Amino acid sequence: MVLYYNDKGFQLGNLLYLLLQAHQDRYYKVDENAAVLRTGWFQLAQAMFPKTTELFSKANGETLYPFAYFQTSGIDFTSEALDSFCKEYLLKSTKELSSKYKKADICLAVRRTDYLKGKNLYYYGFDLFDYVFKALNQIKETEQVEDLSVFTLRITSDDSDWCIGHLVPKLQELYGLKVENIWLEPIDRRENFFQLFACEKYLISPNSTFVYWVGYLLRVANPFVQVFVPNFNTTLLSDGKQIADTRNWIILPVDRESYIES
Protein backbone atom coordinates (compact mmCIF):
# COMPACT_ATOMS: atom_id res chain seq x y z
CA MET A 1 0.00 0.00 0.00
CA VAL A 2 1.35 3.40 -1.01
CA LEU A 3 0.56 5.98 1.67
CA TYR A 4 1.46 9.53 0.63
CA TYR A 5 2.18 12.29 3.10
CA ASN A 6 3.68 15.76 3.15
CA ASP A 7 5.73 17.68 5.66
CA LYS A 8 5.90 20.96 3.75
CA GLY A 9 2.81 22.67 5.11
CA PHE A 10 0.56 21.91 2.14
CA GLN A 11 -2.59 23.98 1.96
CA LEU A 12 -5.81 22.90 0.27
CA GLY A 13 -4.71 23.25 -3.35
CA ASN A 14 -1.56 21.20 -2.77
CA LEU A 15 -3.46 18.62 -0.73
CA LEU A 16 -5.86 18.06 -3.63
CA TYR A 17 -2.88 17.20 -5.83
CA LEU A 18 -1.85 14.70 -3.18
CA LEU A 19 -5.31 13.12 -3.32
CA LEU A 20 -5.14 13.17 -7.11
CA GLN A 21 -1.93 11.11 -6.94
CA ALA A 22 -3.62 8.47 -4.79
CA HIS A 23 -6.58 8.40 -7.17
CA GLN A 24 -4.24 8.17 -10.17
CA ASP A 25 -2.47 5.15 -8.65
CA ARG A 26 -5.84 3.47 -8.20
CA TYR A 27 -7.11 4.60 -11.61
CA TYR A 28 -4.18 3.06 -13.47
CA LYS A 29 -4.08 0.07 -11.09
CA VAL A 30 -0.57 0.89 -9.90
CA ASP A 31 -1.80 0.45 -6.33
CA GLU A 32 -5.54 0.02 -5.80
CA ASN A 33 -5.17 0.87 -2.11
CA ALA A 34 -3.08 4.04 -2.50
CA ALA A 35 -4.07 6.68 0.06
CA VAL A 36 -3.07 9.94 1.73
CA LEU A 37 -2.10 10.28 5.38
CA ARG A 38 -4.64 12.20 7.44
CA THR A 39 -2.58 15.24 8.35
CA GLY A 40 -2.61 18.97 7.65
CA TRP A 41 -5.72 20.31 5.96
CA PHE A 42 -7.44 16.93 5.60
CA GLN A 43 -10.43 17.96 7.75
CA LEU A 44 -11.18 20.94 5.51
CA ALA A 45 -10.82 18.77 2.41
CA GLN A 46 -13.24 16.21 3.83
CA ALA A 47 -15.72 18.91 4.85
CA MET A 48 -15.70 20.46 1.39
CA PHE A 49 -15.48 17.22 -0.56
CA PRO A 50 -16.84 14.40 1.64
CA LYS A 51 -16.10 11.64 -0.86
CA THR A 52 -12.35 12.27 -0.48
CA THR A 53 -12.65 10.50 2.88
CA GLU A 54 -12.20 7.31 0.85
CA LEU A 55 -8.70 8.42 -0.14
CA PHE A 56 -7.44 9.24 3.36
CA SER A 57 -5.93 6.76 5.79
CA LYS A 58 -4.18 6.53 9.14
CA ALA A 59 -0.56 5.38 9.14
CA ASN A 60 -1.34 1.87 10.46
CA GLY A 61 2.35 0.99 10.34
CA GLU A 62 2.56 1.53 6.57
CA THR A 63 5.63 3.01 4.87
CA LEU A 64 5.09 6.71 4.19
CA TYR A 65 5.98 8.15 0.79
CA PRO A 66 6.89 11.86 0.68
CA PHE A 67 5.25 14.01 -1.98
CA ALA A 68 6.81 16.90 -3.90
CA TYR A 69 5.45 20.42 -3.43
CA PHE A 70 5.15 21.18 -7.16
CA GLN A 71 3.13 19.00 -9.53
CA THR A 72 3.53 19.33 -13.30
CA SER A 73 0.78 18.42 -15.74
CA GLY A 74 1.79 15.64 -18.11
CA ILE A 75 4.66 14.56 -15.88
CA ASP A 76 3.26 14.01 -12.39
CA PHE A 77 -0.36 13.55 -13.41
CA THR A 78 -2.36 12.95 -16.57
CA SER A 79 -5.32 14.92 -17.87
CA GLU A 80 -7.38 11.74 -17.88
CA ALA A 81 -6.72 11.04 -14.20
CA LEU A 82 -7.35 14.70 -13.32
CA ASP A 83 -10.76 14.79 -14.99
CA SER A 84 -11.67 11.45 -13.44
CA PHE A 85 -10.67 12.65 -9.96
CA CYS A 86 -12.69 15.86 -10.33
CA LYS A 87 -15.80 14.02 -11.45
CA GLU A 88 -15.60 11.22 -8.89
CA TYR A 89 -14.51 13.06 -5.76
CA LEU A 90 -15.05 16.82 -6.05
CA LEU A 91 -17.76 17.81 -8.49
CA LYS A 92 -20.96 16.71 -6.74
CA SER A 93 -20.33 18.57 -3.49
CA THR A 94 -18.94 21.59 -5.33
CA LYS A 95 -22.14 21.92 -7.35
CA GLU A 96 -24.29 21.52 -4.25
CA LEU A 97 -22.37 23.95 -2.06
CA SER A 98 -21.98 26.60 -4.74
CA SER A 99 -25.65 26.54 -5.77
CA LYS A 100 -26.60 28.99 -2.99
CA TYR A 101 -24.51 31.70 -4.65
CA LYS A 102 -25.74 33.83 -7.52
CA LYS A 103 -23.58 33.38 -10.58
CA ALA A 104 -21.39 36.31 -11.60
CA ASP A 105 -20.46 37.01 -15.20
CA ILE A 106 -16.82 37.36 -14.22
CA CYS A 107 -15.07 35.90 -11.20
CA LEU A 108 -11.69 37.31 -10.18
CA ALA A 109 -9.46 35.85 -7.48
CA VAL A 110 -6.77 38.13 -6.06
CA ARG A 111 -3.92 36.55 -4.10
CA ARG A 112 -1.56 38.96 -2.39
CA THR A 113 -0.46 38.43 1.19
CA ASP A 114 1.90 35.46 0.85
CA TYR A 115 3.48 37.02 -2.25
CA LEU A 116 4.54 40.14 -0.39
CA LYS A 117 6.99 38.66 2.07
CA GLY A 118 10.73 38.53 1.52
CA LYS A 119 12.02 36.34 -1.27
CA ASN A 120 8.52 35.31 -2.32
CA LEU A 121 8.35 38.57 -4.26
CA TYR A 122 11.12 37.35 -6.53
CA TYR A 123 10.02 33.72 -6.69
CA TYR A 124 6.33 34.37 -7.39
CA GLY A 125 5.68 38.07 -8.01
CA PHE A 126 4.33 39.77 -11.12
CA ASP A 127 2.36 42.92 -11.92
CA LEU A 128 -1.20 42.09 -10.86
CA PHE A 129 -2.81 45.12 -12.49
CA ASP A 130 -1.14 44.35 -15.83
CA TYR A 131 -2.37 40.76 -15.73
CA VAL A 132 -5.95 41.57 -14.70
CA PHE A 133 -6.23 44.34 -17.28
CA LYS A 134 -5.04 41.99 -20.03
CA ALA A 135 -7.78 39.53 -19.09
CA LEU A 136 -10.49 42.19 -18.91
CA ASN A 137 -9.39 43.71 -22.23
CA GLN A 138 -9.67 40.29 -23.84
CA ILE A 139 -13.15 39.90 -22.36
CA LYS A 140 -14.14 43.23 -23.90
CA GLU A 141 -12.88 42.05 -27.29
CA THR A 142 -14.70 38.74 -27.00
CA GLU A 143 -17.95 40.41 -25.96
CA GLN A 144 -17.45 43.24 -28.49
CA VAL A 145 -18.26 45.94 -25.94
CA GLU A 146 -16.66 49.26 -25.08
CA ASP A 147 -16.89 48.73 -21.34
CA LEU A 148 -18.05 46.18 -18.78
CA SER A 149 -20.83 48.24 -17.23
CA VAL A 150 -23.48 45.56 -17.74
CA PHE A 151 -21.34 42.77 -16.29
CA THR A 152 -21.29 41.48 -12.73
CA LEU A 153 -17.89 40.86 -11.16
CA ARG A 154 -17.23 38.73 -8.08
CA ILE A 155 -13.91 39.26 -6.30
CA THR A 156 -12.41 36.93 -3.71
CA SER A 157 -9.14 37.86 -2.04
CA ASP A 158 -6.91 37.37 0.96
CA ASP A 159 -6.53 41.17 1.11
CA SER A 160 -9.95 42.80 0.94
CA ASP A 161 -8.72 46.19 2.14
CA TRP A 162 -6.26 46.43 -0.73
CA CYS A 163 -8.97 45.49 -3.22
CA ILE A 164 -11.29 48.18 -1.85
CA GLY A 165 -8.61 50.86 -1.80
CA HIS A 166 -6.69 50.08 -4.98
CA LEU A 167 -8.28 47.56 -7.32
CA VAL A 168 -11.99 48.41 -7.28
CA PRO A 169 -11.49 52.13 -8.08
CA LYS A 170 -9.38 51.23 -11.13
CA LEU A 171 -11.96 48.72 -12.34
CA GLN A 172 -14.65 51.36 -12.08
CA GLU A 173 -12.54 54.00 -13.80
CA LEU A 174 -11.12 51.89 -16.63
CA TYR A 175 -13.93 49.42 -17.31
CA GLY A 176 -17.09 51.22 -16.24
CA LEU A 177 -18.01 48.56 -13.70
CA LYS A 178 -20.87 49.72 -11.51
CA VAL A 179 -20.46 49.60 -7.76
CA GLU A 180 -23.58 47.46 -7.36
CA ASN A 181 -22.18 44.96 -9.85
CA ILE A 182 -18.91 44.43 -7.98
CA TRP A 183 -19.32 41.73 -5.34
CA LEU A 184 -16.35 41.64 -2.98
CA GLU A 185 -16.78 38.51 -0.89
CA PRO A 186 -15.67 38.15 2.75
CA ILE A 187 -12.43 36.27 3.30
CA ASP A 188 -13.38 32.63 3.83
CA ARG A 189 -11.26 29.93 2.22
CA ARG A 190 -14.03 27.35 2.05
CA GLU A 191 -16.79 29.63 0.77
CA ASN A 192 -14.51 31.53 -1.62
CA PHE A 193 -13.87 28.27 -3.48
CA PHE A 194 -17.58 27.69 -4.07
CA GLN A 195 -18.20 31.37 -4.85
CA LEU A 196 -15.60 31.26 -7.62
CA PHE A 197 -17.25 28.14 -9.05
CA ALA A 198 -20.50 30.15 -9.32
CA CYS A 199 -19.19 31.68 -12.52
CA GLU A 200 -21.23 32.36 -15.64
CA LYS A 201 -18.68 33.34 -18.27
CA TYR A 202 -15.11 34.13 -17.19
CA LEU A 203 -12.77 33.10 -14.37
CA ILE A 204 -9.59 35.14 -13.89
CA SER A 205 -7.19 33.11 -11.77
CA PRO A 206 -4.05 34.30 -10.00
CA ASN A 207 -1.03 32.00 -9.75
CA SER A 208 -2.79 29.80 -7.22
CA THR A 209 -3.29 26.04 -7.02
CA PHE A 210 -6.44 26.77 -4.99
CA VAL A 211 -8.06 28.60 -7.92
CA TYR A 212 -6.65 26.24 -10.55
CA TRP A 213 -8.79 23.56 -8.93
CA VAL A 214 -11.86 25.75 -9.45
CA GLY A 215 -10.83 25.97 -13.09
CA TYR A 216 -10.39 22.20 -13.32
CA LEU A 217 -13.90 21.68 -12.00
CA LEU A 218 -15.42 24.30 -14.28
CA ARG A 219 -13.78 22.58 -17.24
CA VAL A 220 -15.63 19.34 -16.58
CA ALA A 221 -18.86 20.94 -15.31
CA ASN A 222 -19.25 24.01 -17.51
CA PRO A 223 -16.66 24.07 -20.30
CA PHE A 224 -18.16 27.25 -21.76
CA VAL A 225 -16.63 29.26 -18.90
CA GLN A 226 -13.37 30.76 -20.14
CA VAL A 227 -10.51 30.52 -17.66
CA PHE A 228 -7.57 32.95 -17.68
CA VAL A 229 -4.28 32.01 -16.01
CA PRO A 230 -0.83 33.63 -15.91
CA ASN A 231 1.96 32.10 -17.98
CA PHE A 232 4.06 31.92 -14.86
CA ASN A 233 4.38 29.68 -11.82
CA THR A 234 7.63 30.21 -9.95
CA THR A 235 11.28 30.89 -10.70
CA LEU A 236 12.02 27.79 -8.62
CA LEU A 237 10.82 25.44 -11.36
CA SER A 238 10.77 25.02 -15.17
CA ASP A 239 12.12 28.53 -15.84
CA GLY A 240 8.92 29.96 -14.40
CA LYS A 241 6.62 28.33 -16.96
CA GLN A 242 3.04 27.47 -16.09
CA ILE A 243 2.81 23.85 -14.92
CA ALA A 244 -0.95 23.41 -14.38
CA ASP A 245 -3.21 21.51 -16.78
CA THR A 246 -4.18 24.43 -19.01
CA ARG A 247 -6.30 22.66 -21.63
CA ASN A 248 -8.70 25.16 -23.24
CA TRP A 249 -7.54 27.95 -20.94
CA ILE A 250 -6.19 31.32 -22.05
CA ILE A 251 -2.61 31.74 -20.83
CA LEU A 252 -1.57 35.38 -20.48
CA PRO A 253 1.99 36.73 -20.29
CA VAL A 254 2.97 38.54 -17.12
CA ASP A 255 5.18 41.53 -16.39
CA ARG A 256 7.92 40.62 -13.89
CA GLU A 257 10.28 43.50 -14.61
CA SER A 258 10.02 45.07 -11.17
CA TYR A 259 10.58 41.70 -9.46
CA ILE A 260 13.68 40.57 -11.33
CA GLU A 261 16.88 40.83 -9.32
CA SER A 262 19.50 43.16 -10.74
Residue spans of the language-model regions?
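Short alpha-helical "patches" and their helix-cap loops
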Residues: 31-44, 225-236
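N-terminal pre-catalytic "stem/leader" segment of glycosyltransferase-like enzymes
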Residues: 1-36
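Short, conserved active-site loop motifs that form the nucleotide-linked donor/cofactor pocket
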Residues: 177-182, 247-250, 257
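Aromatic-acidic/polar surface patches that form glycan- and anion
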Residues: 7-15, 121-128, 207
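Secretory-pathway luminal glycosyltransferase catalytic domains
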Residues: 34-147, 160, 244-245, 252-254, ...
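A conserved amphipathic alpha-helix that caps or lines the catalytic cleft of carbohydrate-
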Residues: 22, 26, 136, 215-218
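Donor-binding and catalytic core of enzymes assembling or modifying cell-surface/extracellular glycoconjugates
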Residues: 8, 12, 145-238, 243
